[in-house]
Structure formats: structure tokens, C-alpha cells
Swiss-Prot record:
Residues 1-734 are annotated as: Core. Specifically expressed in epithelial cells. Component of brush border microvilli. The gene is VIL1. GO terms for biological process: actin filament capping; actin filament depolymerization; actin filament polymerization; actin filament severing; actin polymerization or depolymerization; barbed-end actin filament capping; cellular response to epidermal growth factor stimulus; cellular response to hepatocyte growth factor stimulus. A 1,2-diacyl-sn-glycero-3-phospho-(1D-myo-inositol-4,5-bisphosphate) binds at residues 112-119, 138-146. Residues 735-826 are annotated as: Headpiece. Phosphorylated on tyrosine residues. The unphosphorylated form increases the initial rate of actin-nucleating activity, whereas the tyrosine-phosphorylated form inhibits actin-nucleating activity, enhances actin-bundling activity and enhances actin-severing activity by reducing high Ca(2+) requirements. The tyrosine-phosphorylated form does not regulate actin-capping activity. The keyword Repeat applies. Coiled coil: none annotated. Keywords: Actin capping, Actin-binding, Calcium, Cell projection, Cytoplasm, Cytoskeleton, Repeat. This is Villin-1. Pfam families: Gelsolin, VHP. Epithelial cell-specific Ca(2+)-regulated actin-modifying protein that modulates the reorganization of microvillar actin filaments. Plays a role in the actin nucleation, actin filament bundle assembly, actin filament capping and severing. Binds phosphatidylinositol 4,5-bisphosphate (PIP2) and lysophosphatidic acid (LPA); binds LPA with higher affinity than PIP2. Binding to LPA increases its phosphorylation by SRC and inhibits all actin-modifying activities. Binding to PIP2 inhibits actin-capping and -severing activities but enhances actin-bundling activity. Residues 760-826 form the HP domain.
Amino acid sequence: MVELSKKVTGKLDKTTPGIQIWRIENMEMVPVPTKSYGNFYEGDCYVLLSTRKTGSGFSYNIHYWLGKNSSQDEQGAAAIYTTQMDEYLGSVAVQHREVQGHESETFRAYFKQGLIYKQGGVASGMKHVETNTYNVQRLLHVKGKKNVVAAEVEMSWKSFNLGDVFLLDLGQLIIQWNGPESNRAERLRAMTLAKDIRDRERAGRAKVGVVEGENEAASPELMQALTHVLGEKKNIKAATPDEQVHQALNSALKLYHVSDASGNLVIQEVAIRPLTQDMLQHEDCYILDQAGLKIFVWKGKNANKEEKQQAMSRALGFIKAKNYLASTSVETENDGSESAVFRQLFQKWTVPNQTSGLGKTHTVGKVAKVEQVKFDATTMHVKPEVAAQQKMVDDGSGEAEVWRVENQELVPVEKRWLGHFYGGDCYLVLYTYYVGPKVNRIIYIWQGRHASTDELAASAYQAVFLDQKYNNEPVQVRVTMGKEPAHLMAIFKGKMVVYENGSSRAGGTEPASSTRLFHVHGTNEYNTKAFEVPVRAASLNSNDVFVLKTPSSCYLWYGKGCSGDEREMGKMVADIISKTEKPVVAEGQEPPEFWVALGGKTSYANSKRLQEENPSVPPRLFECSNKTGRFLATEIVDFTQDDLDENDVYLLDTWDQIFFWIGKGANESEKEAAAETAQEYLRSHPGSRDLDTPIIVVKQGFEPPTFTGWFMAWDPLCWSDRKSYDELKAELGDNASIGQLVSGLTSKNEVFTATTTLVPTKLETFPLDVLVNTAAEDLPRGVDPSRKENHLSDEDFKAVFGMTRSAFANLPLWKQQNLKKEKGLF
């Protein structure tokens, strides 16, 4: 029997928020390199551990993923390892069985850029590699609107259909072909995946080109490459509809008591919807069947060990006995550590330290200490780099160097500005830490929401340059404003401040007399930051701490629902924002000048639910649709404001009220049916909801604070600043450089490699003085005015630019153009 080895438990990190992934290789668990996260071989099985910080402790989700071509032995090993890992963690984890192509939304949400299925597996010698691999030739079929899944398919036009998006990956060139019937959201998600492959696997050096299926004639070079690789285009198949599940099926619930008396599986129905928590006896194990769409296994804390260990295998036996699909999702719950998804299936559910219903047990006069999670070097030196999305490799006490991008170059940030990040800037943070004698580095590329396109491009280029300086060894982490990972916050020890606009460069900061409001979020020095929000009362939230800086004072405002930990961190970060004395203002006891500074007192997010530190039913966001004539709701896990697409409608369920958010581009029938759709949601909810629950219809741009309060750092200008699909497509680069790559491809019979020439043929050379500062009309016949540099001899080229042609070709386009202008060859 397989057992969780000390090699695995020794490296397993129980206190770092993020994910860790292992592949089953020869029946052993082998860590997957961080840069390969999101890539899964169809012939293999994987185990994924997700760790989250919850209050004073941690919650865990363990998923075992089964590739469609994996062996029964590997599948069994993955299941056993999952059970053993749960026991190692104290039997508090939620276990999930994931089957390729049928993964849960929770699993897919770990990979925001997309999930890629790769052909082969460990048995055929397939390895998870790091970056800079150009010897690639594959066709990816991309599906999904929110959480994208891409599968490797046969390199043929037969694989295409009119309704989906496909990526032809040729190493240095990635071609995105958009089916004529695919929508903008699908095209945008596929483009994000293509960019992620370019940046994560090719260090930003590959080119991405897009072909619109309804207008292929507009991209002749890319179509030339497609036909060169795939052959002459054949008739494309019709669109295949995405699998959709009727909400009514989700609401069909049956609870079973399962035992294997006399060696036979005995299934006894206990109850149907509505279900209540007291139906679950602590001495037993149960199966909750959600109409065959998903199976939940609940293990009572006092059930015998054998029953607990057999829970997953019993669920699989139940699926077989019911003739359900083998791909049916299975989730295993431990008594007292149930997932929110499981709890919301019951009409009534209470957790320890909470009163029944929506009330909250509050402790008066108790001040919580700032919790310190131990990531000291003594503990960490025996652990390799933790496979976690948030890169929490240590306690942040290593050496950090910070630069700001200025005029496309790096300028060191003064010590007094460390931890201050301005929305008009881009920054590079080089973090150095040691594991024993070995030096390790992480490069964080922080990109402000209002930084220029040139600065965004320069930050990526400078990161590659810095990476090369250290032999391509550092881990690169791109951080968009508002999505700062825990380790980046830990580097600044809870003193990270993010400003909406402005710059820390000379003359770029706003006057010290300006009034600013900061939303402080975090409970310890590893997860705290202050985020600037609009200076108005509506920005406040009863659940958090805020810092209001005025020309004459600086207020520290404590909402009624904030914890002692949050108050302590609020004090710490406030000292960074202002050196003046900070009067503490408790919610409800604000002096008149406080409201004057905010432009007057108005309503803000202050509902009783917001004051609960640990609500038993967390808010849930669903993307809604009635396009098929029936109500469909797709849950968005770990939602943020960025998940709200202005062309769609969404339902935010906070249990005691339902919000229906309507984007400006939503269709008329969805707008008209808003209240009715929300009522249908309540009627079909498996938890037998109160049909009198208030339903609030919210229009984009007119959101009340009771809605925005459920989103971290709500930005009213979010959609006006958001780039369109066409704008993002235009940023991919010019067609000339792609044309050169296509010429290089079609003139050869081989796949692109890192050494593929970017110039298709040898052009006629001319003396330097004939080309420099010469107008197009005065150039000799045969000279391409846009490519003067390619008419230089190799010696002249190196003398002028101080580098070889290949080094020049690896520079970003803006850098190439600047050099050409400087040398008179533009």
C-alpha cells in the first residue's frame, strides 16, 4: 500500500496560503515546478493542496485530479494519498475528486490564466519543464468564459469548430484563431492565456497574433502560417454548445446513510430537501446526492477510523450503484470543517461561537494580539521553494531592492518611499533570500493601474534583463495593482501603501496638503496593505479600518465589525501614511470635522452582516443567463470587482438579501427578468430559502454601498479604465515583426527554435552613409525604408548598434525603434 512519505511531509507547507501540486510518478508524489502550474498531462494523476488563512487558523482543500488516460493504479494512489494528507493535516481538509474535463469551479479558479491539458504523461517520458522552451508545436482548443480550459488536440483543421477559440503554438509565434461564433469574453480569455504562455513559458520573447475567423482576409500572414502547418483549410465544424446544467437539477437533494454491513454496500435514504444540520449524526457517515451532478461524503467526528478511510471508495461505489457518470464530482467533508458549498445546501447551519440564524456572538473588551505565523529561516531551510501561488517562501526578512520604471529605465526608489506604490508607476522588486547556503531570488513586477503602455512594456523588458543578470534563475511574479500576493506584503512588514494615482518620482507626488482616504485590509504583517479609495463617506465599510489623512490631521477610523488584529495593523500602517498624531475614531462617534473632510455624511456599507467576523454563509457571486430560455447560474469562486463583465448580469447572494447586478451591455430580456430571475434562484436554492428575502436590482455605475461593501477596494472608475478587447489586441505588437516570423517559418520545413532567423532572405547591403538620415525618396532602389538596418553589413550593424542582429531582434519593439531613431535609421 502506498504511504505519504517523509519526503512529502517534510516539504509540505501547512502555513503558507496558496497551492502546492504533486504528480504521481511511479506511485510516488513528486512536486511539480511552480512555473508548470496549470499544465496537466492527460496520462497522469495529480494531488493539489490549497491552503487558506481563516481567522486564527488555516483551512485546507485537497484535490486529486485524474487524467483521462491515467491508469487505475495511479488513480487509486492519488485517492489514498489524498486521504493520508487529510489525516496528516488533522482531518480538517475538504477532499475533492476531479476528473479531466469535469473539474469543479473551485479547482479551475486556482488557475485564473487557464488550465492546459497536455498529451502524454510520465509513462511516455513527459516532464514538467521550466521556461524558455521554443521547440514547441501544438494546437490548443480553448473553452470557457470565466475559467478557461485548453486541451491539446490533433494538429488539423478537423479539430476546429466555429464556436470556440484555438491557439496554434509554434514556440516563438502563437496564433490565436477566433471562431466566428465565439464571443468577446471567450476571445479575451484565450488572449490572456496566450499572453500567459508567452510571458511564463517564453519569458516574454514570443509573439502573439490574432486571426478573426469571420475576417481571415485581414490577417494574410497568419493564415499563411496556419495553412503551412495545418494544410489547406477544410470546412469547419459547427459550434458545439457548452455543457450547461439546469438550476432545478442543482436543487434536487437526497441524504443517505451508507454502510457496508456483511461486506455489502448498503444505501439507506434518510431525507430529501429541505435538509437540516441535526440530521447528521456525529457517529455516522453520510452521502449527500445532488441529483447525480455532485456527491458529498460527510464523515462524523465520532465515526470509526475504518469508516472514515473508506468514505471516498464508498462514494465511488455509490456512483456505480446509481449508474451515474464516472466523471461525477465527489467532495468529502470532515465534521466541523465543512465547506461553504456543502453548508449552503442545508436550510439551517450554525458553527461554533455563533448564535443561530444570522446573529453573531461578540466578545466585549477583548483585544486580540497580532498573530505571527512562523516562517523563520530555521524552519524554512529544510524546505525547497514552496509550490504556492503567493510565493510565501519565508517571512519576508530577506534583502529587497526596489526600482521604479522611469523613461523606460530603472531608477532606485529612495528608502523613505519603500512600501509606497503609486498607481501611475511600475516597480520592480528584487527579493533575495537563502535556503541554507543557496541564494534564491524573486522578481516582482508591480504594474500600476494608470501606468503608461510604454512603462508597462518597459517593466516587462527590464524584468527579463534583470532575470538574465542572475542567469535566468529568479522567479518572476507579475503583480497587477490590487492583486498583491501575501509575500510581497510580507516584505514590507505590514507597511505597504497603494495609492490610486500619482508617482513617487521627483515632482510627481501630490501635494502633502491633499485629503486622502485609505482602506486598511489585513490581520498580520504578512497580509496587510492600505489601499487608497475615493474620499467620500460611501467608501467606508463597517467591517474594516480606514485612515483619513487631511491637511491638518490624520484619523484612524475603526468600523464596528473590525477585529483586534485589524486594529493593530491599522495603527502600524497609519504611521507610514502620516507622521502626525492620529486620533482614533470609533464608528458612530465621529467628530463633525471627520464628515466635513469626507464631503458630508452619507450612507455606507454598514449592515449587521458586514459586522460579523466569520459569517457562517459567506457571500457568493453567480454569473446569470437566460439565453437558453431557462435560468442558469455559474458560480465565480474568490470573486473580485474585475469579475463583473458589463455585458452580463450577476447575482450576489449575501443570504439575507439578494443583489442582481445588471451590466450596461446586458440584453433587454435579462434586464426585464431581473426580479423574476432572482425569485427563481431562491425557489430552486437547495437550502430552501425564504422567498421573502429582499431582492435588490443594481445597475452598473449606480451601485449602493450595501453592494460595493462586499468587494475589496471597490473602484467606481473600474469600467472606464478597463481596456477593450480591441485595445488589448492592438498591444500585442505590430504586424511587421509577425510577418517576419511567418516568413521565417514558411521558408523552412522545421519548427521554430530559439535560433530561428527573423529575416527571411538576405537583403542587398549598402554603405552606412547611404542609409543614415536619408529620406525614403532619396534611398537607393531596393531599400525597404522601414527596415534600413537589415540593409547593413553584419560589421556595420554591430558597429552602429553595439550588438548582434539576434540580440537586437530580442529587444522589444519600442526599444528597437528608439535605437533606430537615435542612429538615424528610422
